[in-house]
Amino acid sequence: MTVAIVDCGGENLRSVQRAVEIHKIKAVITNDKAKVSNASFVILPGVGSAQNVMQSLESRNLIETIKSLTQPVLGICIGMHILFDRSEEQDTECMKIISGNVKKFNSDKRFKVPQMGWNKVTFLKEQTKDLDDYYYFANSYYSQIINQTIATAEHSVPFTAAIQKNNFLGCQFHPEKSSFAGRKFLEYFFNKL
C-alpha cells in the first residue's frame, strides 16, 4: 500500500508524510502523474493559497489526473478548497469536483481571522460519531454546509469541517497537527473510505 502526497507547493508535506507513516503505510511526496495514478491513496495537502496550489497542479498537468482518480483522495485545508468550484481567495477557479464555493470568514472582536488553533468538530453520520473531537485549524476561508458535508464546526458561522463525495474526502482541519484525533481521522480515511 502506498500513499502519494501530491507536492503542490505546500509547506506541510513532511508533517503529512510523518502522520501517514505512523499508520505503517509508505508515503511518497511526488508530482509524478504515474505515481499519483498508481498509488493506493492520494493526499492533497494544503498550506498557502488556492491560486498557488491550482497553478502548481496545472503546471504539472495533474488536474485531470486527480479528477479522474478512483482510489480514496484526501484534501487537507486548501487541498479541500480546491475540490470545490471556486475560492474567494484571489477569485480562484478550482477543480469542480464538489459543487460550491469557498468563502472568507468575517473578522470581529470575538472571532479572529485566520482561525488558528483547536476547534470542536461534530461528525454527522452515526458511523463516524466516534470521530467527534477537537481538531487543529489554520484557515481564513471555509465552505458553507452542503449535502456532502460529513462534519461541522463553528467559527463565527457554522461551516464544513469535513466533506465527502464518492472517493473524495476533504477536511478543513489539519489531521497531521491534530494529535490522537487526527490519527483516528486518517485511520478512517485508510480503512473506511
Over which residues does each language-model region extend?
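Short acidic low-complexity segments
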Residues: 27-38
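C-terminal and late-domain segments of enzyme folds
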Residues: 142-193
